[in-house]
Curated annotation (Swiss-Prot):
Keywords: Cell projection, Cilium, Flagellum, Protein transport, Repeat, TPR repeat, Transport. It holds the Pfam family ANAPC3. It is found in: Cell projection, Cilium, Flagellum. It comes from the Eukaryota. It comes from Chlamydomonas reinhardtii. Disruption phenotype: Flagella motility defects. GO terms for cellular component: intraciliary transport particle B; motile cilium. InterPro entries: TPR-like_helical_dom_sf (IPR011990), TTC26 (IPR030511). Component of the IFT complex B. Component of the intraflagellar transport (IFT) complex B required for transport of proteins in the motile cilium. Required for transport of specific ciliary cargo proteins related to motility, while it is neither required for IFT complex B assembly or motion nor for cilium assembly. TPR repeats lie at residues 57-90, 151-184, 393-426. This is Intraflagellar transport protein 56. PANTHER family: INTRAFLAGELLAR TRANSPORT PROTEIN 56 (PTHR14781:SF0).
């Protein structure tokens, strides 16, 4: 029997056609996008469907949901408001709108919108957060009492602890939830790492992040936190390198996120701060604080005060920054009220149970005592954290002055000389304290050389006074005589002449005792005869000349 080949050939062609049809790319379903958390893809699909059918309310709900989770809360809010305009809307849309408003930083509006919705756990959480943001502790405690042991409520409580700088309490909640729901809440590991970062345990934070990033290397939040740890431990360049890795993994899309843009400003030492930070307002909360810091670094104290004067501080960084602004304003204006407020803010942080044993807490107590001029106490706190600031010019500036103010001149000189920043080295305060240390350490010549480097102005005049009086007190009479001589030339006041005469006699006594070279006598006599007051100095000169003649000293 012979079989026809025509049917098998036709069947083969049919199978090929079907296979080709099956291989055509399918349009992904919404569920696929949501499973992958590809909210941008979901938004594209839902927007396309919306154009096809604008009356599909379920499609609109999903579009709002995806906008919200993609971080475009303003667009989600517009859709929820549209949904509320339809007949017999779901009252939960009020609660969802409140969530959008909260993330947009509109906390009062979020509270009002949430109260229009039905009583539910989500409403309570939004009201709880809004009360915290508005600083209403009575409402905060009331809503706290309504929280349950559910995962969502406990995560909310941990978040509030974090916002109130109760990082250990937040960590305890996160760890407990991780033990109970390890597979379900893996991302909570990042929150634990965030708390350790805030507690200054940067190495612990990095260790925790390492485990998470090995599974999710493109996590924007985790990579950003790793960058922050590197910034704290190393420098801005090391931090920025981590963000470049994130950019490569994400195709650069994450770099447009407000948080990343904010952190890049910080990592780059304030570069583009005035372009990036003002539009951010308080999202993230550090944006306003970093803008204040930017103004302070550029000596724009008025602008910094304008940003912070109406802010009610609630976290240690806010209290510290407010203290710094008041301290700088008090120094610029000579206003003791601002200095008093600064001292009080520093004390609030440094004496608090949560901060007293932290590095910032001890810095605050040192600053508090600095403003009170209790320098022995300043040294107690600065010495306890010295190992963390070995090459820090700001730290050495404060430590050096505190040591000098307590009479520890040798240590003060060593500390002040470690400062490399010209901003400090060119300040009169630095020059005057270093000059005093030189004199007290028997190096009056170095103090005089510092004076010779200055231009003639009020600061050089003040330094002359310091050199004249300190050298006289320490028995460095030759340089005291030189300083009083210049002072007399600038201002022929009788006290400068008397000072010069006394210093000249002291220098002569040192020469006679063999503690100064005899050749110095020629300079001393020249100083006494140099001004219009030479006649008043002639009796002293006569005694000196007689001694020189008797002792074979050529003048």
């Amino acid at each position: 029997m012979f079989y026809s080949k025509s049917r098998p050939q036709h069947a083969a062609r049919t199978n090929v056609a079907q296979a080709a049809a099956n291989e055509k790319p399918k349009v992904p379903e919404l569920e696929e996008f949501l499973t992958k958390r590809d909210y941008l893809g979901a938004i594209a699909l839902l927007s396309f469907r919306r154009h096809a059918n604008r009356n599909d309310l379920k499609n609109l709900e999903w579009l709002a949901y995806c906008y919200f989770h993609y971080g475009e809360h303003d667009k989600a809010l517009v859709i929820y408001k549209e949904l509320l305009q339809h007949e017999d809307p779901d009252p939960m849309f009020f609660v969802y709108s409140a969530a959008c408003l909260y993330y947009m930083g509109m906390y009062k509006e979020a509270e009002e919108q949430a109260l229009q919705g039905p009583k539910c756990a989500l409403q309570t959480r939004i009201l709880f957060h809004s009360a915290q943001r508005q600083g209403n502790d009575d409402k905060l405690m009331a809503y706290h009492g309504q929280l349950t042991d559910s995962i969502e409520d406990q995560l909310t409580l941990a978040s509030i602890h974090y916002q109130r700088s109760h990082f250990q309490e937040a960590t305890d909640i996160y760890k407990r939830l991780l033990l109970e729901h390890r597979d379900y809440l893996r991302s909570t590991v990042v929150y634990v790492a965030l708390c350790y970062c805030k507690l200054d345990y940067y190495d612990v934070s990095l260790e925790i992040l390492g485990v998470y990033l090995s599974a999710f290397p493109d996590s924007a939040i985790a990579v950003n936190l790793k960058a922050c740890n590197h910034f704290r431990m190393y420098n801005g360049k090391a931090a920025e390198a981590e963000l470049k890795t994130l950019a490569e993994l994400s195709g650069g899309q994450h770099l447009d996120h407000d948080l990343i843009r904010h952190n890049l400003v910080v990592f780059r030492g304030g570069e583009n701060a005035l372009q990036v930070l003002p539009p951010l307002s308080d999202i993230p909360p550090e944006a306003r604080l970093n803008l204040v810091i930017h103004h302070l670094r550029h000596h724009e104290v008025g602008e910094a005060f304008g940003l912070i004067k109406d802010m009610e501080p609630s976290t240690p960084p806010e209290f510290i920054l407010k203290a710094v602004v008041h301290a700088m304003l008090g120094q610029v204006k000579g206003d003791p009220e601002h200095l008093k407020k600064a001292q009080q803010y520093y004390q609030l942080v440094g004496a608090s149970a949560s901060e007293c044993d932290t590095i910032p807490g001890r810095q605050c107590m040192a600053s508090c005592f600095f403003l009170l001029k209790q320098f022995e106490d300043v040294l107690v706190f600065l010495s306890s954290i010295k190992t963390y600031f070995l090459n820090d010019d700001d730290f050495n500036w404060n430590l050096g002055i505190a040591k000098a103010a307590t009479g520890k001149y040798k240590e003060a000189e060593e500390t002040l000389l470690q400062i490399a920043n010209d901003k400090y080295r060119n300040e009169y305060t630095y020059t005057s304290w270093l000059a005093r240390c030189y004199i007290m350490n028997g190096k009056a010549r170095l103090a005089w050389e510092r004076y010779l480097q200055l231009e003639t102005n009020d600061e050089s005049y003040q330094l002359l006074l310091l050199i004249a009086n300190d050298c006289y007190k320490m028995g460095a009479f030759y340089f005291a005589c030189k300083a009083f001589d210049v002072l007399e030339r600038l201002d022929p006041a009788p006290e400068y002449l008397e000072g010069k005469k006394g210093a000249a006699c002291g220098a002569f006594q040192m020469i006679v005792a063999g503690k100064e070279p005899k050749d110095l006598l020629r300079d001393v006599i020249s100083l006494l005869r140099g001004n219009n007051s030479a006649d008043q100095c002639e009796p002293i000169v006569a005694v000196m000349r007689k001694w020189a003649k008797n002792n074979g000293v050529k003048l």
